[in-house]
Amino acid sequence: MNRYKDAGVDVEAGYDLVKRIKKDIAATSRPETSGTIGSFGGMFDLEKLGYQHPVLVSGTDGVGTKLMIAQEMGINDTIGIDCVAMCVNDVLAQGAEPLFFLDYIATGHNDPAKLAQVVHGVAEGCRQSGSALIGGETAEMPDMYPKNEYDLAGFSTGIANKEDILTQDLAKEGDILIGLPSSGVHSNGFSLIRQVLFKDHHLKVTDRPEALEGKSIGEILLTPTKIYVQAVLSLVKRHLLHGIAHITGGGLIENLPRTYNDDLQAEVNLGAWPVQAIFRYLQNKGQLKEQDCLNTFNMGIGLVLLVPKANVLQVKEQLKQKNEQYYEIGKLRKRPIGEKKIVFNGSFK
């Protein structure tokens, strides 16, 4: 008799999970990593990177109630990409190169096959961002979570030379705002999405509204959050940018002003980029005002680069070389007394 297992915690299932994820973890290895899976801590040799005045930059995040969509659909192998993306894009926004990542999974019942799929997604996100997955924790808590549910969070650490950190002081009047498209909703606003679609309108994740061009609601919503590291890190290292805004919870309204001082104002042209069908669909179904959408969703722009005028052509050319789409969406100007830090012109396409 195993009293611990009877109480709801299966240690053997934990060992099974570790075996299943070893190959995925190994695929994220970097030359700076050391130690083995199962050690008490993950290790990373900073000296090999050759930074002169290194500053570590850390970020942590989860996936929010997007997890509920994944679990309802039984699609667990992409939600880990979202978790990594939410963390590494934040680290990138400070001007840092993501180095390593740790994940935390909490569940009511350790299903090794299911959770291995989750970690597979985490590993894929790490590969896309150049991060080593150096550790993690799986907590089986039968009285805390329902049997078939899990929660996921992650922790990213990056590095930059102190003088290369992107701060608000770098942004200047006349800087051009270049927006990089999102892959969709990303990982924010899902409580509102679920309220509008599933509670107010009683829709199902398997429904295929005509407005979504034949794709199911669940399929669209589960599109992984885009990771921007490969496209943007080289621009940071070449000192071509004055700032980066990761457009997450709070949308453009809350996140873009975080990149510049109070004496500046962002002027954003709403017609400068196409808005994906899912945002129009949500706006119509929820009868949401444009301002509410801008304050909740990314509305098609996942990352905004603050670019000095003199660097705009070079930045655009390098983005083209990376096959990264971009839109010139506005500029920074002096903030008139009494006005907000961000204003919008026109309307969405």
Curated annotation (Swiss-Prot):
Localization: Cytoplasm
EC number per UniProt: 6.3.3.1
Catalytic activity: 2-formamido-N(1)-(5-O-phospho-beta-D-ribosyl)acetamidine + ATP = 5-amino-1-(5-phospho-beta-D-ribosyl)imidazole + ADP + phosphate + H(+)
One biological process term in Gene Ontology: 'de novo' IMP biosynthetic process
Entry's Gene Ontology molecular function annotations: ATP binding; phosphoribosylamine-glycine ligase activity; phosphoribosylformylglycinamidine cyclo-ligase activity
InterPro entries: PurM-like_C_dom, PurM-like_C_sf, PurM-like_N, PurM-like_N_sf, PurM_cligase
Name assigned to this protein: Phosphoribosylformylglycinamidine cyclo-ligase
Organism from which the protein derives: Lactobacillus helveticus (strain DPC 4571)
Gene assigned in the entry: purM
